[in-house]
Amino acid sequence: MAKDDVIEVEGTVVETLPNAMFKVELENGHTVLAHVSGKIRMHFIRILPGDKVTVELSPYDLTRGRITYRYK
């Protein structure tokens, strides 16, 4: 999958789950299961419920995503 194929959307973290997984509610109302990208994990960036984040979604599975940015 090329980098151009991903869909970037913004959302809010609703719930934290084990193994660095999060339930994120997108701006359009959908809820997706998202994991943390490697750079966020490397730099020990904390993500808590209520945080606004950017999520990358694959066009093949719109129910799962990757958190790529946490807004300050």
Curated annotation (Swiss-Prot):
Any single GO CC term annotated in Swiss-Prot or TrEMBL for this entry: cytosol
Phosphotyrosine modifications at: 60
Gene Ontology terms for molecular function: ribosome binding; rRNA binding; translation initiation factor activity
Keyword vocabulary terms for this entry: Cytoplasm, Initiation factor, Phosphoprotein, Protein biosynthesis, RNA-binding, rRNA-binding
SMART domains: S1
NCBIfam families (UniProt xref): infA
Subunit structure: Component of the 30S ribosomal translation pre-initiation complex which assembles on the 30S ribosome in the order IF-2 and IF-3, IF-1 and N-formylmethionyl-tRNA(fMet); mRNA recruitment can occur at any time during PIC assembly.
Family listed: Belongs to the IF-1 family.
Descriptive protein name: Translation initiation factor IF-1
Native organism: Bacillus licheniformis (strain ATCC 14580 / DSM 13 / JCM 2505 / CCUG 7422 / NBRC 12200 / NCIMB 9375 / NCTC 10341 / NRRL NRS-1264 / Gibson 46)
Gene that this sequence comes from: infA
